[in-house]
Design a protein with these regions (language model features):
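Sec-dependent bacterial lipoprotein signal peptides
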Residues: 1-21
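Alpha-helical segments in soluble extracytoplasmic regions
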Residues: 32-103, 107-126
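Membrane-proximal amphipathic alpha-helices
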Residues: 26-30
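Short, low-complexity, Pro/Ser/Thr/Gly-rich segments in the mature regions of secreted, periplasmic
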Residues: 124-136
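Bacterial signal peptide processing site
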Residues: 19-25, 133
């Protein structure tokens, strides 16, 4: 009788233990993002204020920061989301670089491409925030 009770308790509590590990893994994975998120905030403010001499370089550094964080993340859900955000920062960097290379020749299409890249980045960054449970 006692064995059955113990077996039932172990069976009932085992999923909770596994879930706890998953949550801890997700939490530690999301903690790796604190540096890149701070860098992203500063870079965006500087770019918006026109203080960044080369926004493309700033955005490339952000992509690298996310890639560095991703290398330390083992949670597959968070890692996939971080990798997507890093790729989006690279795309934004390329589009910004194309515009800043010759601002006099910036056409409407290049501007729209950059805006679309930022929208895509915003979508994926928001998904990452939801994955990590960040409130904003």
């Amino acid at each position: 009788m006692k064995r059955r009770i113990v077996a039932a308790l172990v069976t009932a509590l085992l999923p909770l233990g596994v879930t706890g590990c998953s949550i801890a893994s997700k939490t530690s994975a999301c903690e790796e993002l604190s540096g890149p998120l701070k860098e992203a905030g500063v870079a965006l403010v500087n770019a918006r204020l026109g203080e960044a001499e080369n926004p493309g370089e700033s955005f490339t550094k952000l992509a690298e920061a996310y890639e560095t964080a991703s290398a330390k993340i083992t949670n597959s859900e968070v890692k996939a989301s971080v990798d997507q955000v890093a790729a989006d920062w690279r795309t934004v960097a390329e589009k910004a670089q194309a515009l800043s290379a010759d601002p006099a020749k910036a056409d409407e299409e290049k501007i729209q491409d950059l805006q679309a890249a930022f929208e895509q980045l915003n979508t994926h960054q928001t998904e990452l925030f939801h994955t990590c449970g960040y409130k904003y």
